[in-house]
Amino acid sequence: MASVTLKNVCKAYGDVLISKNVDLEIQEGEFVVFVGPSGCGKSTLLRCIAGLEDITSGDLYIGEQRMNDVEPSKRGVGMVFQSYALYPHLNLYDNMSFGLKLSKADKSEIKKRVDHAAEILQLSHLLDRQPKALSGGQRQRVAIGRTLVSQPNVFLLDEPLSNLDAALRVQMRSEITKLQRKLGCTMIYVTHDQVEAMTMADKIVVLDAGFVSQVGKPLELYHYPQNRFVAGFIGSPKMNFMSVFIEGVEKDRVQVQLSNGTTFWIPVDGTTVTRGERMSLGIRPEHLVEAEHGDAKIEGKVMIVEKLGNETQVYMNLKGSDSDVIYRQPDTLDVETGDTLTIGIPAHRCHLFHSDGRACRRLHKEKGVDLPA
């Protein structure tokens, strides 16, 4: 195990800056997920840590050693790619031991490591088979096993589940999480899927256009996003946003006016808010409530209803507004397309964002997570 530290790291291809002034500390044994949309620089950053890409400026440390100029093979990292990259003519044992054989490791040591990795990954009964005889999930476990036998200080995984179907992705993400907990290893995992990030990580790093937008525990990012980008990216379905007018401001609350004229107070830090300002109110679909239980009411025409059995998702167009809202309830709702529906907004679950995307600090304490300072 080893820690990983990035200090003001930048990566450019010619004049195009991909990773921008990244400062990050990853502790020994921590499971960290880099997440963000396509093109945000998450895989590039991972490849810089692995040594597959040169760092343009800044410093990378693994443990106490500066790694900028150290060869990839000497960094003590193991990488699992999106592609399994297995040798089709070799059986599982030979695929997993290939790197150790190249390094001329002792045969008994090779067997010991491969057998141990196969036992952990539940592949012991498949070691004599070739990759073509395996399922996608089994092939991915072999790719992980090949990295595991090298006993790296840091595991790097670049979207390893992208080639799997939905059901297998759910199974494999739990297996990878259990493996990381069992080994206690430092693991950095790249994905564009925020559900993977929320369910697997000790700490999430959200990247936006090469910048680190926010770093924190999953529930910190969910309940206390620092900006509108993180608020909209974390959570599924994504957060609802609607334009509001600021009617009143106090130190620990802000009064907003909705497009339908309704006003109510939101418990957020008001020290950065100006009366008369236009801001953006955010509320998650699962935090909307029945009309009688809200501090404010909104009405809209039902456009789409998704009845999933365990929950219902209703897509609405708000009356007197161009805004669309998603309403999510853990039950089957008696509502159909074309209906008019009135729902409630609970003030303590609201988020408030400035025009530049900065969030006002929420003052409501959510369960399972500390209030940000």
UniProtKB/Swiss-Prot annotation:
GO molecular function terms noted in the UniProt entry: ABC-type maltose transporter activity; ATP binding; ATP hydrolysis activity
Enzyme class: translocase
Every ABC transporter domain range: 4-234
List of residues binding ATP: G36, P37, S38, G39, C40, G41, K42, S43
InterPro entries xref list: AAA+_ATPase, ABC_transporter-like_ATP-bd, ABC_transporter-like_CS, ABC_transpr_MalK-like, ABC_transpr_MalK/UgpC-like, Mo/tungstate-bd_C_term_dom, NA-bd_OB-fold, P-loop_NTPase
Function: Part of the ABC transporter complex MalEFGK involved in maltose/maltodextrin import. Responsible for energy coupling to the transport system.
Family: Belongs to the ABC transporter superfamily. Maltooligosaccharide importer (TC 3.A.1.1.1) family.
Assembly: The complex is composed of two ATP-binding proteins (MalK), two transmembrane proteins (MalG and MalK) and a solute-binding protein (MalE).
Name used for this protein in its record: Maltose/maltodextrin import ATP-binding protein MalK
Organism: Vibrio cholerae serotype O1 (strain ATCC 39315 / El Tor Inaba N16961)
Source species taxonomy: Bacteria, Pseudomonadati, Pseudomonadota, Gammaproteobacteria, Vibrionales
